[in-house]
């Protein structure tokens, strides 16, 4: 029975594995041939060595390797050829270079022939056995024999590498060649290298186009090094660059019509040549940008150039000629480029404007018109773009950057707001982004303590940050807004009021009126934050104004002072009323009392009565919580007691109304305590005013005692409170409170209201101790 053979399955290699296999085979062959070449050279067998060198180069004739693998193989071969180069230069072979130069031209295949020719030719030049210009011209012409994109590209790169230190420059003799010969050589090599690099895109099928483009990008340095060689020539000065080098380079860049090549070559051109050269040829470079293919990212190219020249001009202002208007050149050319590219992405357009703005603020920091022009051009472009483009994160980020740059540079919001195109650009943003910019403006103003003295400037600022000040159509529902963030924002807006100041009282009051007009549009959720500091600043204003009048700094007759006081009163009163209208009763009540004290200090008595009545009205109608009522009345009593009202009729009327409100409190204990406290309204003893009405004092205390005595469970504490009020007047040694009244009160407390478990008992005991320590006559303990 015959034995069946097992079927064999052919292994299928992946593309990566196949590349690795091809590369390893070629590399091994190169190393084997290289080993034999070195042995031959060591044994002075030059012709054998050249044969092995030719075999090394034969491996570079392959079409099986990707550009990346081919580059790796080239580097291995390059090392062996350098060994050969060194041997030839040391002249151990005993032959003249002209002989060797002719010998290697008989190599069988064109690629090995040209590599060997370049190797020998570089030594030919170095040993000065032939003029460099003639050998270079011969080599550059010979290289035309290889038109395969990959092989030709690396051949010309080899030519560039081995001749880089042998190029004629400014110190070369005329016979050997001039710098112009080197320029012609490099530009010719650059042109041919670029053509080969561009042609590489056609080597792969259409489906592999993306892969091939990526492979091309990996080889871009082979082309760019030619421009680096040009920049390294000492003989290439600004004149030579602008008249000879640049026109030929940009001609090749434009004519190649390849977006990858154009993108890279423009970037490397800007990188390798000095900034002074770019300054002198700015128009040419920018006009070249306008002629590039539509797929080229001109924004990156121009932005790179702008940033470089802006930094150069900042460091070396004296090296920038007066006749070169950097900003004007960039601005006009950028405008033309944008117009010529209707499909240019908005984010790229905005990126160019960011660079332009940085340029003008670095080079011309005092020229605000340039900055305004940039913002204006940007805004005019944005309004014609679709909203979905404007709201892209990258676009939003750049618009905000455009708005932030002037704030960071000037550190003065007054300067920024003079840019007429600043505010219209903000309006192009969505609500949240407008709010962010507005907050940046507010923070900048606060952090730099920018004092704003002119009404027009205040109006401009508040219009610019209106997103923070009033409701807008595109804002989220208030329920969706974070309450803490909102409160923090409004507090910052409110703090701006303290930066509104002017030595001219008329201007300052006008500023407050403008601020009130803007803040008043904010609705109940905003004005609770913004109007309060405005009230306090207005009260401070009238105090300062009065002080200036009294000291003679401002000359004003009584009638005019009263008229001005009336205006400020109306302003303050209406501002507080706006808060009262949104049910901020406690706050409004306190503000009225604050205003009452201020107008009393300024001697505007009639206004004091009006403010007190307004406060009492809020107390009656809007303060419902009984604890809040007690606190409010205590505050009112303290405020009235501090007044210096010369008109007793007005004062007694206010005191009577206060007692009336106290008698209406919910709890009898509170009624009694507050009415007893009201007794101080009739015994005023302070530096600004002396007023004593003993009858009213006693009447208030008796009324308080009557109220608490009629309670079934009055509590000890209230009686002791009244007793302490009585002792206050005893200490004043006044007959307002008879000693007998106090003695009877003590007896009443001891015999009727003292209970062992009463929490107020220590309070009573301490009071009794005080009475004993004072030795009051007529009070028996």
UniProtKB/Swiss-Prot annotation:
Annotated GO CC locations: cytosol; endosome membrane; late endosome; pathogen-containing vacuole; retromer complex; retromer, cargo-selective complex
- InterPro entries in alphabetical order: Vps35, Vps35_C
Which superkingdom heads the taxonomic lineage of this protein's source? Eukaryota
Main subcellular localization, coarse class? membrane
Q: List the keywords (alphabetical).
A: Endosome, Membrane, Protein transport, Transport
- Has keyword Chaperone? no
Listed GO biological process terms: intracellular protein transport; protein retention in Golgi apparatus; retrograde transport, endosome to Golgi
Keyword Protein transport attached:
yes
Q: Where in the cell is it found?
A: Membrane; Endosome membrane
How does the protein's chain sit in the membrane according to the entry?
Peripheral membrane protein
List the Gene3D superfamilies.
Answer: Vacuolar protein sorting-associated protein 35, helical subcomplex Vps35-C (1.25.40.660)
* Pfam families membership: Vps35 (PF03635)
Write out the coiled-coil annotation as residue ranges: none
> What family classification does the UniProt entry report for this protein?
Belongs to the VPS35 family.
- Tell me the function of this protein: Plays a role in vesicular protein sorting. Component of the membrane-associated retromer complex which is essential in endosome-to-Golgi retrograde transport. The vps29-vps26-vps35 subcomplex may be involved in cargo selection.
Q: How does it assemble?
A: Component of a retromer subcomplex consisting of vps29, vps26 and vps35.
Q: Under what name is this protein listed?
A: Vacuolar protein sorting-associated protein 35
**Chain's gene name:** vps35
């Amino acid at each position: 029975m015959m034995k069946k053979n097992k079927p064999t399955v052919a292994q299928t290699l992946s593309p990566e594995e196949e590349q690795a296999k091809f590369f390893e085979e070629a590399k091994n062959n190169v190393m084997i041939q290289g080993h034999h070449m070195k042995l031959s050279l060591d044994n002075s067998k030059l012709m054998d060595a050249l044969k092995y060198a030719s075999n090394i180069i034969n491996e570079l004739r392959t079409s099986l390797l990707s550009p990346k693998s081919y580059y790796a193989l080239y580097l291995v071969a390059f090392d062996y050829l350098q060994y050969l180069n060194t041997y030839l230069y040391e002249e151990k072979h005993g032959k003249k270079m002209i002989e060797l130069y002719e010998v290697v031209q008989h190599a069988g295949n064109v690629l090995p022939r040209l590599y060997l020719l370049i190797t020998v030719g570089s030594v030919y030049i170095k040993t000065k056995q032939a003029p460099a210009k003639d050998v270079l011209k011969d080599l550059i012409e010979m290289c035309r024999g290889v038109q395969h994109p990959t092989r030709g590209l690396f051949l010309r790169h080899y030519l560039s590498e081995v001749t880089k230190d042998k190029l004629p420059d400014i110190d070369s003799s005329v016979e050997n060649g001039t710098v112009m010969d080197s320029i012609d050589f490099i530009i010719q090599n650059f042109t041919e290298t670029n053509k080969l690099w561009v042609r590489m895109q056609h080597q792969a099928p259409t489906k592999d186009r993306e892969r091939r483009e990526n492979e091309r990008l990996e080889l871009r340095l082979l082309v760019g090094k030619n421009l680096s060689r040009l920049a390294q020539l000492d003989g290439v000065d600004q004149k030579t660059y602008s008249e000879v080098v640049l026109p030929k380079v940009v001609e090749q860049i434009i004519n190649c019509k390849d977006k990858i090549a154009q993108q890279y070559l423009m970037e490397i051109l800007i990188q390798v040549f000095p900034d002074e050269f770019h300054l002198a040829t700015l128009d040419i470079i920018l006009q070249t940008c306008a002629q590039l293919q539509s797929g080229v990212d001109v924004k990156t190219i121009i932005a790179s150039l702008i940033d470089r020249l802006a930094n150069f001009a900042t460091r070396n202002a004296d090296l920038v000629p007066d006749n070169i208007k950097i900003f004007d050149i960039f601005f006009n050319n950028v405008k033309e480029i944008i117009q010529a590219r209707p499909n240019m992405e908005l984010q790229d357009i905005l990126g160019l404007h960011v660079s332009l703005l940085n340029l003008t603020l670095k080079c011309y920091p005092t020229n605000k018109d340039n900055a305004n022009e940039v913002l204006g051009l940007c805004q005019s472009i944005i309004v014609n773009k679709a909203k979905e483009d404007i709201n892209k994160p990258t676009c939003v980020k750049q618009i905000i950057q455009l708005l932030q740059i002037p704030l960071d540079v000037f550190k003065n919001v007054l300067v920024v707001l003079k840019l007429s195109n600043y505010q219209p650009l903000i309006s192009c943003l969505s609500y949240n982004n407008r709010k962010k910019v507005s907050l940046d403006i507010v923070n900048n103003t606060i952090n730099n303590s920018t004092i704003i003295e002119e009404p027009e400037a205040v109006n401009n600022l508040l219009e610019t940050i209106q997103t923070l000040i009033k409701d807008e159509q595109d804002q989220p529902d208030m329920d969706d807004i974070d309450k803490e963030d909102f409160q923090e924002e409004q507090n910052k807006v409110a703090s701006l009021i303290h930066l509104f100041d002017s030595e001219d009282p008329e201007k300052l009051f006008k500023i407050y009126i403008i601020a009130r007009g803007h803040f008043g549009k904010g609705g109940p959720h905003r004005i609770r934050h913004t109007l309060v500091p405005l009230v306090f600043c207005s009260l401070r204003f009238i105090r300062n104004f009065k002080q200036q009048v009294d000291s003679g700094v401002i000359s004003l007759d009584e009638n005019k002072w009263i008229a001005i006081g009336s205006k400020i009163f109306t302003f303050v009163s209406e501002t507080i009323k706006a808060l009262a209208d949104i049910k901020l009763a406690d706050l409004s009540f306190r503000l009225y009392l604050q205003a009452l004290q201020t107008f009393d200090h300024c001697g505007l008595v009639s206004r004091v009565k009006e403010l007190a009545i307004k406060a009492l009205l809020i107390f009656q109608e809007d303060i419902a919580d009984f604890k809040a009522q007690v606190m409010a009345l205590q505050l009112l009593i303290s405020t009235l007691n501090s007044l210096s009202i010369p008109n007793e009729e007005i004062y007694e009327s206010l005191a009577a109304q206060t007692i009336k409100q106290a008698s209406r409190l919910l709890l009898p204990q509170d009624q009694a305590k507050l009415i007893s406290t009201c007794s101080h309204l009739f015994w005023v003893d302070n530096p600004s005013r002396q007023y004593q009405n003993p009858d009213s004092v006693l009447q208030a205390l008796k009324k308080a005692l009557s109220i608490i005595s009629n309670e079934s469970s009055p509590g000890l504490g209230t009686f002791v409170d009244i007793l302490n009020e009585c002792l206050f007047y005893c200490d004043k040694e006044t007959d307002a409170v008879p000693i007998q009244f106090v003695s009877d009160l003590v007896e009443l407390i001891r015999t009727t209201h003292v209970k062992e478990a009463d929490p107020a008992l220590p309070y009573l005991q301490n009071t009794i101790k005080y009475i004993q320590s004072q030795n009051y006559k007529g009070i028996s303990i």
